Amino acid sequence: MTDSKINVAILGVGNCASSFVQGLEYYKSEQDENGLISDVIGGYRVSDIEVVCAFDINKSKVGKDLSEAIFEEPNNTVKFAEVPNLGVNVKPGKVLDGIGKFVEDIIDPTEDSENVIKDLKESGAEILINLLPVGSDEAVKFYADCAIAANVGLSL
């Protein structure tokens, strides 16, 4: 096993992010690895993954701790794990494309942030996990460029 952490940033605090963050907490506290292909990969356990930064464009999520933001509407993922305060306030992203027609009337977008690269660097993130909605082509390109500039890997 390794003593080091994998510091990740989340791009898009929607239902997938909610399941991911809850899953991290669930498997950190459970001795049972049911549902995992393997409890150790490359010397790392689920408990070695730490979310250090998150971005979203929805005003109802930005500025809140990630543990709260993952349950904000329009998210509707079933709550299956208790998520303590993570000390990770959701940062504003940049509004480009990818806001679906079913949520465009629900989401109140933030003002664009020019600090994505700075936020990634300051957080110590090693990997930016892309959880943006399908159709976010321009947004993915923008955040890929930000990840490159911040020397952070990008998981599509």
Q: Model features per residue range: what roles?
A:
Residues 134, 142-156:
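Beta-strand-loop-alpha-helix segment that lines the small-molecule cofactor/substrate pocket
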Residues 1-136, 140-142:
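N-terminal glycine-/serine-/threonine-rich beta1-alpha1-beta2 phosphate-ribose binding loop
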